[in-house]
Amino acid sequence: MKAYQRQFIEFALSKQVLKFGEFTLKSGRISPYFFNAGLFNTGRDLALLGRFYAEALVDSGVEFDLLFGPAYKGIPIATTAAVALAEHHDRDLPYCFNRKEAKDHGEGGSLVGSPLQGRVMLVDDVITAGTAIRESMAIISAHGATLAGVMIALDRQERGRADLSAIQEVERDYQCKVISIITLKELIAYLAEKPEMAAHLDAVKAYREQFGV
């Protein structure tokens, strides 16, 4: 586990973004942990979050020309990641995001920000079913751009309805790499370092045995 990954887990725990317990997911599964990136909701939170996204993007080595944040959750993530890449990595890259409803006045259209072109890095909080990615791909393709990769905060490394995870399906369907700040593997490694979290570690391991990929 890299230093920034450990720091991100501690950041998520401190903001109650990452919680342990029993949580019913949309799939109906009872998960021993829950991740809600919407609780990164202050200026300092966003500044830090952008730095973690930027660190993981640079660390991945994936080349891209533009950051795209799908509405709504992807919008602040793309914005803060773009700022962090410029401030901390000297990479001043364009970014844009889509509107849910296209405007018919002013500048018009369904996109805000830089023109959507070149190799696009799509940034979001998590991938659950991959629906948002598919919607974004339609927008990216319509503008003649290509998908360089997808960047999320947490990869749950969990099977969907079939044998693959939603992330593996995205990688297969769009021939792109999905990057995450952390995966379930790092989360388990972190829990294993903390004797006081032994009960949570056992629960998460049992869940991985049942639903992991």
Curated annotation (Swiss-Prot):
MF terms (GO), sorted A to Z: magnesium ion binding; orotate phosphoribosyltransferase activity
The answer on whether this UniProt entry bears the keyword Magnesium reads: yes
Q: Which residues are noted in the entry as orotate-binding?
A: F34, F35, T128, R156
Instruction: Give the catalytic activity.
Output: orotidine 5'-phosphate + diphosphate = orotate + 5-phospho-alpha-D-ribose 1-diphosphate
> Would you tell me the Gene Ontology cellular component terms?
cytoplasm
Task: Write down the Gene3D superfamilies for this protein, in alphabetical order.
Answer: 3.40.50.2020
Q: Which domain of life is it from?
A: Bacteria
**Entry EC number(s):** 2.4.2.10
Name the record gives this protein = Orotate phosphoribosyltransferase
This chain is encoded by the gene named pyrE
